[in-house]
């Protein structure tokens, strides 16, 4: 193996090891402008996009001890390495696809040490984020509390009203 390829292989191995997960993509009609825009979007969620040869990527997976089936990935691969939350990176891919006519196709991925198919990665990307889930839970907790406060407020205003009426009757 040439020295350049060995260096690239080591670099990819390091990215696989350092990342929380990765997503394999096929890119169709992906221009330089799209690539720049996509990379900028991913940097906001601590992820990066690399175009790699299939052979080098799967060799790096093998030497890193990660098992994954190459599936139907041919030629060059687009790989998103997620150093933060891999689900957020998957969401960025999904959002980018909506804006750019599905120019990226999910092939496979690895999230939380679990290998996923392209469909599974896409399904994970469609789930609510942790932030959205927290907001929903807070909303579920806050709604009954606000109802209790409203009921207590109406009970107290009823008591005040009753006392006012009693005071008016005694003054008459």
Curated annotation (Swiss-Prot):
GO BP terms in the entry: translation
Pfam families per the UniProt record, alphabetical: Ribosomal_L10
SUPFAM superfamilies: Ribosomal protein L10-like (SSF160369)
PROSITE patterns: RIBOSOMAL_L10 (PS01109)
Cellular component annotations (GO), alphabetically ordered: large ribosomal subunit
Protein origin, superkingdom: Bacteria
Keywords attached to this entry: Ribonucleoprotein, Ribosomal protein, RNA-binding, rRNA-binding
GO MF annotation terms: large ribosomal subunit rRNA binding; structural constituent of ribosome
Function summary: Forms part of the ribosomal stalk, playing a central role in the interaction of the ribosome with GTP-bound translation factors.
Matches recorded under HAMAP family: Ribosomal_uL10
Subunit structure: Part of the ribosomal stalk of the 50S ribosomal subunit. The N-terminus interacts with L11 and the large rRNA to form the base of the stalk. The C-terminus forms an elongated spine to which L12 dimers bind in a sequential fashion forming a multimeric L10(L12)X complex.
Family as reported in the entry's similarity comment: Belongs to the universal ribosomal protein uL10 family.
Protein name as it appears in the record: Large ribosomal subunit protein uL10
Provenance organism: Chlamydia trachomatis serovar L2 (strain ATCC VR-902B / DSM 19102 / 434/Bu)
């Amino acid at each position: 193996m040439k020295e350049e390829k060995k260096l690239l292989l080591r670099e990819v191995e390091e990215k696989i090891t350092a990342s929380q997960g990765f997503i394999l993509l096929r890119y169709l009609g992906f221009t330089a402008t799209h690539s720049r825009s996509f990379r900028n979007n991913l940097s906001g969620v601590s992820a990066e996009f690399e175009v790699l040869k299939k052979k080098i990527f799967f060799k790096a997976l093998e030497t890193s001890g990660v098992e994954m089936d190459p599936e139907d990935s041919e030629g060059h691969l687009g790989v998103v390495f997620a150093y933060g939350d891999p689900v957020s990176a998957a969401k960025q891919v999904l959002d980018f696809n909506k804006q750019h006519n599905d120019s990226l196709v999910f092939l496979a991925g690895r999230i939380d040490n679990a290998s996923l198919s392209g469909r599974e990665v896409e399904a994970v990307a469609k789930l609510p984020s942790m932030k959205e889930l927290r907001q929903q839970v807070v909303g579920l907790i806050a709604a009954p509390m606000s109802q209790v406060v409203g009921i207590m407020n109406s009970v107290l205003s009823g008591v005040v009203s009753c006392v006012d009426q009693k005071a008016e009757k005694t003054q008459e």
